[in-house]
């Protein structure tokens, strides 16, 4: 049996950088406003995994109203989510992540993001795809007000 999940996340810029995307620190003049570390890629990916096992979203499991999660490392959240996936008897087939940002440029960091995600999800590098796009200067990401991310996962029975 297979299951598919989709995730989406957005964070606006504010404060000082750097930012963390896909588990990788990226130099930028601004940071991302968030309760945790603001990693939109790992948040979208976590939501996709939770959706695939019909377990809600990261807001339910790691609420921003709980100080326990303030400044949380999203890689640790992702690992926790993946433990839940495995507890349901599933493993990752593949993940596809799309980062939507006018700035900063993500290309120099994509390989490191794929490696970090593959490590956290206990899978081969070939099962992880991360890509980035812009909105051609349209919308909040185009105006450099924030970053968005979508993720899709395919799970299979272990």
Swiss-Prot record:
Name of the protein this chain belongs to: 2-C-methyl-D-erythritol 2,4-cyclodiphosphate synthase
Organism, as annotated: Vibrio cholerae serotype O1 (strain ATCC 39315 / El Tor Inaba N16961)
Enzyme Commission no: 4.6.1.12
Associated pathway: Isoprenoid biosynthesis; isopentenyl diphosphate biosynthesis via DXP pathway; isopentenyl diphosphate from 1-deoxy-D-xylulose 5-phosphate: step 4/6
Job of this protein: Involved in the biosynthesis of isopentenyl diphosphate (IPP) and dimethylallyl diphosphate (DMAPP), two major building blocks of isoprenoid compounds. Catalyzes the conversion of 4-diphosphocytidyl-2-C-methyl-D-erythritol 2-phosphate (CDP-ME2P) to 2-C-methyl-D-erythritol 2,4-cyclodiphosphate (ME-CPP) with a corresponding release of cytidine 5-monophosphate (CMP).
Residues reported in the UniProt entry to bind a divalent metal cation: 9, 11, 43
InterPro entries the UniProt entry points to: MECDP_synthase, MECDP_synthase_CS, MECDP_synthase_sf
List of residues binding 4-CDP-2-C-methyl-D-erythritol 2-phosphate: 9-11, 35-36, 57-59, 62-66, 101-107, 133-136, 140, 143
Domain of life: Bacteria
